[in-house]
């Protein structure tokens, strides 16, 4: 049976975990110095390596031949944990096992000594989903666990955890993986799989994945199902993106105040089954790039794209004033909010573009122009503007 890429290339040692060196180096040192905590909390956005690091840690503390804090993956314990024939590492999904009874069963089970390794390790994923009663039941065990037990809690929403739980765990915050780091890993995997992944496509996948390497590998997997030669056009098609050309066409329509052309582009995208909500998000990200180049002197490091695309962004942004960009961002953010609450996505997008192409239609612009005119007249008369109501 075919194994998806993110499972096939899941790291088995800390050295293979990308973008989380601040976490892996600390964990390795703790294992080397035998300063292993009784409870760990791994928090961060999805796809950043929390569960992967938890599994590596569980193997490393039980490994018979651990070297430099890493599991050897060759001893009987490592192989048994990988194959599931040794049951000293228990993975629990708190989303479906979130009741008091589930935690009470866990507490009773934790009293048994490990069958083969040194520790019984409990990995509780999505721990924020536990009920209040379940947290209370877990509290005492976290405070005074048996010497042979280690808890590893993983969550994407650490703010939902009680302070009493947080204070009893050693916390590690997983960062979003940088696009440059992710694109390197994607190209490595593509090469191993016999794919041709160009630089533009790798950067685009990293941008869509938004810091989650698992998502990036899933997109790469989808693209490989279509073709072994992967370019940015294929990635855009697979991910349902409008593509750079469409975004630049739409921004040109705003510059020339051509609402008719904007409607035509939106209609073509809609007929080709592009997601209108996704298009709204893409426009926000596209205009955000304009905002960055117009406000930051050295903006290259803040924009995720190739050098050619960066030059295109700079050229296109010259057609907008900073005020225009901020106003457009406000309109699209407002449209996105309405779309998420159930409004018709296509209509909201069309309204936003018409307002941008026909500024006088927006009453907010009229009121702003009127206020500016009043302030200018006050300044000309020598009135202290700061004292005006």
Range-by-range predicted roles:
Residues 23, 83-87, 102-108, 118, ...:
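Extended, largely alpha-helical regulatory/partner-binding modules appended to the mid-to-C-terminal parts
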């Amino acid at each position: 049976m075919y194994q998806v890429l993110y499972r096939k290339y899941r790291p088995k040692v800390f050295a293979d975990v990308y973008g989380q060196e601040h976490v892996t180096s600390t964990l390795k040192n703790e294992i080397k110095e035998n300063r292993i905590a009784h409870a760990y909390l791994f928090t961060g956005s999805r796809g950043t390596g929390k569960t992967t690091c938890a599994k590596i840690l569980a193997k490393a503390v039980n490994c018979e031949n651990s070297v430099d804090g890493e599991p050897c993956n060759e001893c009987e314990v490592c192989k048994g944990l990988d194959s599931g024939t040794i049951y000293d590492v228990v993975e629990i999904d708190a989303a479906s096992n979130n009741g008091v009874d589930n935690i009470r069963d866990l507490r009773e089970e934790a009293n048994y000594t490990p069958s083969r390794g040194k520790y019984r390790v409990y990995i509780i994923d999505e721990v924020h989903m536990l009920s209040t009663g379940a947290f209370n039941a877990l509290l005492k065990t976290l405070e005074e666990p048996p010497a042979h037990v280690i808890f590893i809690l993983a969550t994407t929403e650490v703010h939902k955890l009680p302070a009493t739980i947080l204070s009893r765990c050693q916390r590690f915050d997983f960062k979003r993986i940088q696009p440059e780091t992710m694109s390197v890993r994607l190209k490595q995997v593509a090469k191993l799989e016999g794919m041709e992944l160009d630089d533009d496509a790798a950067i685009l996948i990293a941008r869509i994945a938004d810091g989650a390497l698992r998502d990036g590998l899933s997109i790469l997997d989808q693209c490989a199902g279509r073709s072994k030669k992967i370019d940015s056009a294929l990635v855009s098609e697979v991910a349902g993106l409008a593509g750079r050309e469409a975004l630049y066409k739409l921004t040109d329509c705003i510059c020339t105040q051509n609402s008719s052309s904007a409607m035509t582009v939106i209609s073509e995208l809609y007929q080709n089954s592009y997601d209108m909500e996704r298009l709204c998000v893409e426009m926000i990200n596209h205009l955000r790039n304009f905002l960055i180049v117009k406000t930051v002197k050295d903006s290259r490091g803040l924009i995720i794209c190739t050098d050619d695309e960066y030059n295109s962004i700079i050229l296109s942004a010259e057609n907008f004033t900073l005020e225009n960009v901020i106003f457009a961002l406000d309109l699209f953010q407002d449209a996105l909010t309405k779309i998420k609450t159930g409004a018709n996505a296509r209509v909201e997008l069309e309204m936003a573009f018409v307002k941008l192409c026909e500024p006088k239609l927006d009453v907010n612009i009229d009121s702003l122009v009127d206020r500016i005119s009043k302030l200018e007249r006050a300044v000309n008369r020598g009135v202290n503007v700061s004292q005006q109501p």
